[in-house]
Amino acid sequence: NWMNNDFMKIENNQILSQALYSFDLSIFSLYPSLTTGGTLISLSRDETTNFKLLFERLNKTVINTWISTPSFVDICLLDPSFTEKEHPQLVQFILCGEELTKKTAEKLLTAFPSANIYNTYGPTEATGAISSVKITKELLTENDRVPIGFAKPGVDLKIMDKEIIIVGDSVAKGYFENPEKTEQAFFTVDGKPAYHTGDAGSISADGMLRYQGRIDFQVKFNGFRIELQDIEAN
């Protein structure tokens, strides 16, 4: 219930749904809107691929909670009217699916200085986000790279050989009909399910998780995973 407890306390919440429903980020908007009586604001494929249509739709739509990938909000920041002055009801941003760059975080904080902006982190294999942190000027000043937050309830984060390991009940059992890949990625720690994220990272004394890049050849584009070796091979 942490999603509802942390982010869904806005009455009559109008929640943006940017992600495709085949993308795990979509559950951030879909299920909280259903369980809290909010309204789901869906964008058409044309609106997400045509900037003119996108900006027109946003300028005539009331949104309270914005849920998207960082790259999508970066696109929207190209519109001069995407500001707190023009969108006073937009009071919360929840970003996930790829790294939030410091540049994008600074631009968003400048455009919406009163909004609550959260950077979240978590792979599909751990049922979505497993950590989050509120973006502030102080946080950005103190860090060269935007941190990815503190662990959510039921999640234990570890660093093993510089890799972020997720431990807890949110970790999946494995990949469907792919035992070889399952064996490579999933294991147990003290009898609890654990997952190799493939992300390099560190955890500070106060529990803050920081992302330090990939330890393999995988990159993310608009939230989707791309294996560079597959591109080279094909």
Residue ranges and their predicted role:
Residues N1-Q14, D24-N64:
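Conserved AMP-binding/adenylation subdomain of ANL enzymes
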Residues N116-N119, K134-N234:
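AMP-dependent adenylate-forming
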Residues Q14-L16, S22, F28, I41, ...:
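Short, well-ordered beta-strand segments
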Residues T35-T39, I63-I67, L77-N143, D156:
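Gly/Ser/Thr-rich phosphate-binding loop
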Residues A19-F23, D46-E47, S71, T124:
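Conserved AMP-binding
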Residues S71-V73, L100, V171:
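Alpha-helix capping/helix-boundary segments
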